[in-house]
A protein has these predicted regions:
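Class I SAM-dependent methyltransferase SAM/SAH-binding core
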Residues: 1-37
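Conserved acidic residues
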Residues: 41-42, 78
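A short SAM/SAH-binding and catalytic strip from SAM-dependent methyltransferases
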Residues: 42-62
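Short "lid" loop at the C-terminus of a central beta-strand within the Rossmann-like core
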Residues: 51, 84-90
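Charged helix-capping and loop-helix junction motifs
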Residues: 59-68, 99-102
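Conserved beta-strand signature within the Rossmann-like core of class I S-adenosyl-L-methionine
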Residues: 69, 73-86
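Class I S-adenosyl-L-methionine
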Residues: 91-137
């Protein structure tokens, strides 16, 4: 197995960061509170980060999502990878504040802002989609 050189886990939740700092003891892993990596990294992977909306207004939440992606993209040297809950037609936010993105539109937005973007879906997880944005394409 290849050696991992370093890992930084970033989260907004103080509780999550404290748990990780106190429970995970790898010399190559550090944890920080924030919206994006505190320094340049090869890969930024956001898993579930953008799914929980703090508003019921889709356009407002999508601005927040794109703002977060832009900040992470600035720190990503190779790739930005993120997943979202997805829907077939129009982006929406559920009653319990889960954001569902229309994947073709999100892919187009990412391609216009960042460059080559691949959308990955799996029939086993029909409401989940992963977006992979690569630099230098």
């Amino acid at each position: 197995m290849p050696k991992i050189s370093n890992y930084i886990g970033v989260d907004l939740s103080k509780e999550v960061i404290n748990y990780c700092k106190n429970s995970i003891n790898y010399e190559w892993a550090t944890f920080a509170r924030g919206y994006q990596p505190p320094y340049k990294v090869d890969f930024t992977i956001l898993s579930g980060t953008l799914n929980y909306a703090v508003t019921d207004r889709v356009e407002l939440w999508e601005k927040q999502v794109l703002n977060c992606l832009e900040k992470c993209w600035e720190k990503s040297c190779v790739s930005l990878i993120f997943n979202l809950q997805v829907c077939k037609n129009v982006s929406w936010i559920s009653d319990d504040k889960i954001y569902f993105a229309e994947p073709n539109r999100m892919k187009e937005i990412c391609e216009n802002k960042f460059g080559k973007t691949t959308y990955i879906s799996n029939t086993l997880l029909p409401d989940d989609g992963t977006f992979v944005v690569l630099r230098g394409n």
